Amino acid sequence: MEGSEADLLHITDQEQAHLVPEDCEVPVVVTVHDLFHLRPREIKAGDIRVPVGNQRPGLFRRRDLKRLKAGLERADLLICISEMTKRDVERMFPGKPTALVRHQIDLDYWDPEGNPRSRDLLTEHDDDSKCLLITVGSDEPRKRLDFVRDVIASLPEEVAQDIHMLHIGSEVELSDEQLVTALQHAEALLFPSISEGFGYPPAEAMAAGCPVIAANLPAHNEVIPERCLLPATDVMAWVDEVVKVHAAWKRAGGVPRNPDDSLIDYVRDSLSPEAQGEALSRAYETACR
C-alpha cells in the first residue's frame, strides 16, 4: 500500500485475510462469508448431529487458520454477509466493528421473461411429462440431501410416480445455462440445508421465479420469505408442501408454471446490486471515519 492513493483496502474473502497488512496507512476491510472453518461445529438435526466445517484440519491447514484469524484481528472492519455470520464474528472478535452487506443477485441473468431458457436444454436430465423438483448444492452432510430423499420416499404413491427429482451439483453436473433453465422451469427448489453463510441457491431460484421450500434455519432464512420456510426436521410438513406443489402442477395439466413475480420482487427489493451497493457504501463510510 506504500505510495498508493487508495483510501481503503478491501479484502473480499476471509480466506485471504492473512494479507491484511500490519500498521496499514489506510483502513482495511475484510468480507467474512462464514466462520465454519475457523469455528467448526456440530448442529443438531432431529436425532442426528451434522458436522459443519472441518472438525480435524491437518497441520498445514491449522497453520493457515491461525494466520487467517490473526489477519481478521488486524482488520479495521469486518463485513458480514448475513446476520448469523455477523453474530459469529462478534463472538469470536468482541469489540471489532462489523457491518452487514448481503450478497447481490443478478436479476437480469435469472429473469424468466427477460432472459428465458428453453426446457429443451435439460433434455438429457429431464422428463417433461413429470413434475420437476430440484436441489442445488454439494452432497456434504450439512446440505442434508438424505432428508429430501426421505421426503420423496414418504410421498403418496400417486404423487411420487409423477415426481422427477433432479439433484444438481451432487448427482448431476449442469452448465451455467442449464442451471438457469432448471430454476426457470422447476416446480420448486427444495433446500433443507442445516447451515449456510448466505444461501445462494434459494435466492437465485426466487430471482428466476421458482417457488422455494427451505428449512427455517440460518442464514438462508434471513433472505427467504416466511411462507417458503418449513421446520427443518418435520418430514411430513415437507411432504404436505410437495403434495401441494404437485396438486398445482396437476391442476394446470402438467404445463409449465408461471413465474412467481412476488418472489422476483422480493429479491429485487432486498438483494439487488443497488441494495448491496448502498450497504457497501455505508460500510466504507464507517471504516473511513
Which stretches of residues belong to each language-model region?
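Carbohydrate transferase catalytic cores enriched for Leloir-type hexosyltransferases
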Residues: M1-R289
